[in-house]
Amino acid sequence: MRKILFFGLLSICIFLVFFFYKQKENNIIYNKIVEEFEDNIFIDETYTHLFKDSNLKELVFIKSQLIIPELEHKEMMKSTGYYADTYRALSTVYKFDFKVHENKILGFKSVIFEGFEDAKVSKHENNLPSEKWQQLKDFNIGDPNINEKFFHLEFPFVVKNTLRVTISKGFFKKIKKLKRLKIMLISNEDREYKIDIENFLPKYNL
């Protein structure tokens, strides 16, 4: 019995190792989590693209949905006011996380989506909820100088910088139509980090 249990666990471990290795080899990780609390539903989908030959190590797309049935009726969705506006803004949220490894703390002063160079960009903190959040333009890159006092420092180890870009629903619909996602990040030191990958948004129905 012990031998059967041992070999069963060993087989599961081998399968898991193979699964994660295969995902990493393909440079793609997709995950979906559905949570229910009372009558409400929270859905979190993440798509991660790993890069090997660049200081830009990961692109993570996050789609978060909050469904509150009692607020979904037509009258509520058409009404105005802080409560209604906040729920409409937060019911579905789209975000990109760009993870850049350097020996410095970075700020990012610009993000350019090819084909939408004239997009309207806001640069306020990504804290939610807030009145600024409700006034989101095409996308928000946060305050590029929030860590300015550390920009001059260099470290003897890798610093994992994360830039979060929050996308409006309207802009998300635009980039979803692209065949390829071509994105350029520009740091506070004018260094460019470029992405050119197949557009995964339609494929995963995000």
Curated annotation (Swiss-Prot):
Pfam families: BPTA. The gene is bptA. The keyword Cell membrane does not apply. Coiled coil: none annotated. It comes from Borreliella garinii (Borrelia garinii). It comes from the Bacteria. The lineage of its organism: Bacteria, Pseudomonadati, Spirochaetota, Spirochaetia, Spirochaetales. It is found in: Cell outer membrane. Residues 1-19 form the signal peptide. Virulence-associated protein essential for survival of the bacterium within the tick host and therefore within the natural life cycle of the Lyme disease spirochete. NCBIfam families: VirAssocBptA (NF045772). Keywords: Cell outer membrane, Membrane, Signal, Virulence. GO terms for cellular component: cell outer membrane. This is Protein BptA. Belongs to the BptA family. InterPro entries: BptA.
